[in-house]
Amino acid sequence: MRRYAVILNRRQRNTITLRQLFNEWLPIHSQSISDSAVKSYHIAFKHISNISDMPITNIHFQHHQNVINSMHVKGLSYSSCKKVRTLLNKLFNYAIIKDYAITNYTLHLKLGPNIPTIQRKVFTRQQINKLWAIDTSYSHMILILLYTGLRIGELLNLRKQDIYRRSSYLIVRHAKTKAGEGRIIPIHHRIMPLIEQLYRDTDEYLFAISYTTFHKHFKDIMKQLNCKHTIHDTRHTFASLLDAVAPPNTLRSLLGHKQGDITTRVYTHKTIRELRKAIELLK
């Protein structure tokens, strides 16, 4: 009987899958880490889904490397690859301790070059003044991005029904993230005339153009300014200018960053006044 139990235990060790190993390891490891760290492990595990149902004794070096190679093909960052390697390393170290596996190949994985991330650049006051001087529909779009902090996708999805002219604010109904949906952004007094004109001149969407068309004109205007900005630099500029003067919670609310329980977001007159006060700090 004892010999049978030993054989059965060995067989179970030989058939445990990577998914089963993860589900066994995470509850133990999560006792000493933050919720955000637990979430990052779940995200990393999704990248190894191709081998997650394989018995760990059948997973060799090339299986690991193929996971990393696949991430490169998808254009994922060095940081993402490193997080996956870290997770695999922890899992197989745990497997060795539990006598499920005898080899950890992760230290030999090649992650590829660590290419620096894009350095965002802030629009200068001189560049913003030149945008006002250019005075075209596309320079107006860039100014609206600068004074609202909207993502370009959010701007292109704005409809007339999202603009509350009497109260002088807009509502973002189509956002990149759930945290950004339904947020209120007061309209700065300098861009209110631009919004009013768009409201009068359009039928449904404020900007009836594609991203490709806008991107082309954006690059043309950047040439006029003799600078190399990306569209996202407008949002970065908005955040940077307000970061030093606006309360952190107010800035997160304007940018649509997650804070607390987003399902219970309630705007009061006081909240909107605080948002407007922050927006008007922009010059």
What are these regions, as identified by a protein language model?
Residues I16, K176-K178, M192, P248, ...:
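Catalytic-site neighborhood detector that most strongly recognizes the C-terminal catalytic loop/helix
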Residues N14-L18, L26-Y94, K98-Y100, A208-T212, ...:
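N-terminal core-binding DNA-recognition domain of tyrosine site-specific recombinases/integrases
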Residues K82, I97, A101-T103, L107-I152, ...:
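Basic, Lys/Arg- and aromatic-enriched nucleic-acid-binding interface segment
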Residues T57, I102-T103, R166, I171-R173, ...:
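Major-groove DNA-contacting interfaces characterized by cationic-aromatic clusters
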Residues A133, I185, Y199-A208, H215-G260, ...:
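Short, basic (Lys/Arg/His-rich) helix/loop patches that form interaction surfaces
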Residues M1-T15, Q31:
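N-terminal helical hairpins
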Residues T148, N157-I195:
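Conserved tyrosine-mediated DNA breakage-rejoining catalytic core shared by Y-recombinases
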Residues R11, S167, Q197, D201, ...:
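C-terminal secondary-structure termini that scaffold catalytic or DNA-interacting sites
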